[in-house]
């Protein structure tokens, strides 16, 4: 697959379940969101189980179940997988107008479990989304010489009840680098879950996402310093 292993799964949930999940999202302006608002990203997220309404709680439980992980194994052929019950980096995600997420590599080591993060599952949950607003996940190839993203290869359009599952260990650059242009009051809603494998001995440990600057940011020293500071800060937490 180009640029790395990924699977797009439409009609992921029964449509009535998908609609109910979308309706259970908190209001975007509710104060308990964690707001990532910096030169690299503009999104809100929540991953606390105690805040999930009943159906959302049940769905995250199912997506982390042995039964569902067996389904993931059948789709991907990856045999050794563990759930991330703590939803580290997962849970609810929301983007408003102007929301974005620079192209990046996910962290590859779960800091609590010391397992390799192997697969990322994202399900889009905004009905009646116009794809001209953006919001589709972009998958980019890897430039071996610069060790940076090379070019956009795939855009997985933000279509209601569509899931994308992808391998995060293959220099899997991805993101939403172009600010979303949806109307005010419309939001890109998604849920995310990650699956892990045993840690290979030769793994280059990265416990925090590694971001790349956009083309417009490539010569912006403040942005480049911010990217370095994120990595340095995390390395001090080991």
Language-model-detected regions and their locations in the chain:
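N-terminal auxiliary "cap/dimerization" subdomain that precedes the catalytic jelly-roll/cupin core
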Residues: 1-42, 66, 217-238
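Histidine-centered active-site/metal-ligand motif
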Residues: 6, 104, 174
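Short beta-strand segments
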Residues: 8-10, 91, 120-122, 165, ...
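Signature of the catalytic double-stranded beta-helix
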Residues: 20, 24, 44-89
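PAPS-dependent sulfotransferase catalytic core
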Residues: 43-55, 121, 189-196
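Acidic, glycine-rich loop-and-strand cores that form catalytic or ligand-binding grooves
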Residues: 83-84, 90-94, 116-117, 128-129
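Catalytic core of Fe(II)/2-oxoglutarate
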Residues: 98-99, 109-117, 127-238
């Amino acid at each position: 697959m180009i640029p790395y292993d990924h699977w797009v799964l439409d009609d992921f949930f029964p449509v009535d379940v998908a609609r109910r999940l979308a309706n259970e999202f908190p209001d975007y302006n509710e104060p308990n969101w964690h707001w990532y608002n910096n030169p690299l990203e503009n999104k809100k997220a929540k991953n606390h189980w105690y805040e999930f309404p009943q159906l959302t709680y049940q769905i995250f439980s199912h997506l982390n179940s042995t039964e569902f992980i067996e389904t993931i194994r059948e789709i991907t052929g990856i045999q050794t997988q563990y759930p991330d019950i703590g939803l580290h980096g997962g849970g609810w995600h929301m983007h408003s107008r102007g929301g974005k997420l620079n192209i990046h590599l996910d962290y590859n080591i779960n800091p609590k479990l010391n397992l390799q993060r192997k697969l990322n599952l994202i399900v889009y949950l905004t009905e009646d989304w116009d794809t001209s607003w953006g919001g589709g996940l972009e998958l980019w190839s890897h430039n071996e010489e610069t060790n940076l993203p090379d070019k956009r290869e795939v855009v997985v359009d933000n279509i209601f009840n569509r899931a994308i599952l992808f391998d995060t260990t293959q220099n899997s650059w991805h993101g939403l680098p172009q600010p979303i242009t949806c109307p005010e009051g419309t939001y890109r809603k998604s849920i995310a879950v990650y699956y892990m494998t045993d840690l290979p001995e030769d793994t280059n440990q990265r416990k925090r996402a590694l971001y790349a600057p956009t083309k417009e940011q490539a010569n912006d020293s403040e942005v480049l310093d911010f990217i370095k500071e994120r990595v340095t800060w995390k390395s001090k937490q080991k």
